[in-house]
Amino acid sequence: MNVTVMFLVLLLLTMPLTDGFNIRATNGGELFGPVQRDAGNVLDHGFQRRRECPPRCPTSHCNAGTC
């Protein structure tokens, strides 16, 4: 097995451990501290700062970023 294949296999095995979304979903992002948690909040709640509708909200019931 050459080095490239070994590297790709190692990358595939370690990807779930380094996935920020999975870490944030399981323990609130505490593993990487406040920076990771803030990045998650930007991803999750950016629509509220922009005063847009949340993805789960029907547009007819949306008002200033909240349902």
From Swiss-Prot:
Increases calcium current amplitude through Cav1.2/Cav1.3 channels in rat pancreatic beta-cells, which is a prerequisite for eliciting insulin secretion. Stimulates insulin secretion in NIT-1 insulinoma cell lines. In vivo, significantly decreases mice blood glucose levels as of 45 minutes after treatment, similarly to insulin treatment. Has a potential therapeutic use in endocrinal pathologies such as early stages of type 2 diabetes where the pancreas's capability to produce insulin is still effective. Disulfide bonds: none annotated. The lineage of its organism: Eukaryota, Metazoa, Spiralia, Lophotrochozoa, Mollusca. It is found in: Secreted. Keywords: Cleavage on pair of basic residues, Disulfide bond, Neurotoxin, Secreted, Signal, Toxin. This is Conotoxin Cl14.2b. Contains 2 disulfide bonds. Residues 1-20 form the signal peptide. The cysteine framework is XIV (C-C-C-C). Belongs to the conotoxin L superfamily. Its main location: secreted. GO terms for molecular function: toxin activity. It comes from Californiconus californicus (California cone). Residues 21-48 form a propeptide. GO terms for cellular component: extracellular region. The keyword Ribosomal protein does not apply.
